Amino acid sequence: MAVDGLPITEQWIREKLNLQHRCLADVRSLTLPGTYEGKICHLGTSLKNFVRLKSLDLSYNALVTVQGIEHLELLERLNLYYNRLASLQDIFSLHKLQNLKELDLRLNPVVKKHPHYRLYLVHAIPKLRRLDDCPVRDRERKAALMHFSSEENLDSDYKKQVFIQDTTARSSDLRIKAMQKMVKTLSLLEGNEELALNDSSRKTGKRRSLQTLSVRCENECSPLLAHENPSESDIVYLFNDSDCRRSSKHKQESAPSKSSDYKNDARAGPHRVRFVSPVILRHSSVRGESVFTAHPDSHKQPHSHENDCSSPKWQNQLLDRANLVLHPPRLTYSTAETKDRSTKTLKGTYRKPMELLLSMMEDLWSEKKENQQNRTFLMKMVQILSMMEQEVSGGEQEIQTLKAALKASIAQADVQEKQHQSEIEELTLQQQQAHESIKRLNEQTKSLLEENVSLQKQLIRAEHKLLASRLKNIPHTQDRGVQSVPEEFNTKRDIIADDEDGGVGEQQQSYRSLIARNERLLQQLEEALMSK
C-alpha cells in the first residue's frame, strides 16, 4: 500500500490490482481510487507501459500534478475527482490528450481559484464532451474560441509593438477579469448560463455605453474583419442573441451613418479597424449592392428595372438562360389529383436550396464583367447540381419501388390471412360435426343399454313364472303315481320318492342361483348406466 507523500510504481500497481498479465498495453481500464490508509501523490513513470489505456480513475487521491499521463494518447475517460490540483499549470499537460471525452476535476483547488478553467480545457481539448459531470455545450465552445483567439491575437500584436497606448491599457488581464466575473455566475446546470451572462451584461451595460473603444491594428487581409479582436460584449452577444435581434432595427438605423468612417480609414492609410461602439462590433455597417435578375418564367417584374432590359448585360443574361448547359431542364413530378391535394407536401422540395444557390451564383456573375473563368465556374457548378438532382430523383424512384414492393407484400399477407381464416373455419365446422356424431352415438348406446336391461328384466320374470309352474306340477304327479302303483311296490315308491325329492331340491337350488346371478347382472347394468 502506498504511503502519503510517496509516488507509486508499476510493481505497486501490479500488487495492488493483482495484475499478472505481462503485456500492460492490453489493459484498457484502470481504477486506482485513494483510501484513508494511503493516497497517490505522484504518478511518475508508473503508467509508462499502459499505452492503450482508455479509462483512468484517480479519484480521492492527493495528486498535485498530472505529469505521467501525457503519453496516454488513447485516453477517453479521466477521473481526477477530489485531488490537490491547484493551478492551471498543474493540469497543463492535459492538452496533449486530444482523444479525451470525459474529465472530472471537481473538489480540486483549481476549480475555485480559476473559474475560467472550463474555457481553457474546452479550448485545449476539442473532443471533450463532458466536464465535471456536465455536458460541454456549443456556447461554451464559442466563448472559449473567442476568448483564447483574442488572447493569441493580443500576444502576437504585442510582440510586434504595433498597439498604441490605449490598446495596452486594455490588456488581457482586464479581459480575463471580465471573463472571471461572468464565469463565477455561470452555473453548471442546463440553461443557467443565459441568465448569468444576461445579469453580467445588464450590470456592465451602463458603464459600456459611456465608453468608446478605439483599436487600431495592421490587417493584411481586409479592413472589414470587425471580429478579429472581440471583447466581452461579443461573448455576451453569443449567449444573448435574442436580445440583440430585438434591438436590430435601432442598430441598423445608426449603422449606415458610420459606414463612411470605414471607407475614409481604408483610403487614408494602412488597413485598420476601428470599433466606435458595441453596435459596430456586432453588426457590419458596409453597404451591399445587388443586381436583380429576373426569372424567365416570371410575368411580373419590378418597376425599377423595366427600363434596364434593353441593356447588353440583360440581353446576355437572357441568352444564357437559353443555354441548356448553363440551365439544364429541372425534373418535374406529377401527382394524382385528389381532394386534399393542397394539404400534401409537394415533391422536389430539395430544389429550393439549389435554386437559391444558382440565383446567388447568377448574381455574383452578373455583377462582374463577362470572362471565361466565371463562365466555366458557373457551368461546372450547374453540372454538379444537375448530378445532385439526378441522384435525388434516383432515390425517389427507389423509394417508390420499395413502396410498391411493400404494398405487394401487404396484399400477399392479406390473402394468406384470408386463406388461413377459411381453413380455420372449415376445421371448426368439422370439429362441430364430429362432436354431434359423438353425441348421437352416445344416445344410441344409452338406448341400447336400456333395452338390454328391460329384456333382462323380462327374462328374469319369465324364468320366475316357469319355475313357479314347474313347482306346482310336481305334487300332482306324485299323487297320481301313488294311486296307480300297487301295494307291493310301496317300498320301491318310497325309494323313488326319496330320489325325486332330492332331484327337486337340487333343481330348486339351481334355479335360485340363476335368479341371484341375474339380479347381480341387473345391478351391474344399472350402475353402468348411472355412471355414464
From Swiss-Prot:
It is found in: Cytoplasm, Cytoskeleton, Microtubule organizing center, Centrosome. Its main location: cytoplasm. LRR repeats lie at residues 52-73, 74-95. InterPro entries: CEP72-like, Leu-rich_rpt, LRR_dom_sf. Residues 247-268 are annotated as: Disordered. It holds the Pfam family LRR_9. The keyword DNA repair does not apply. It comes from the Eukaryota. This is Centrosomal protein of 72 kDa. It comes from Danio rerio (Zebrafish).
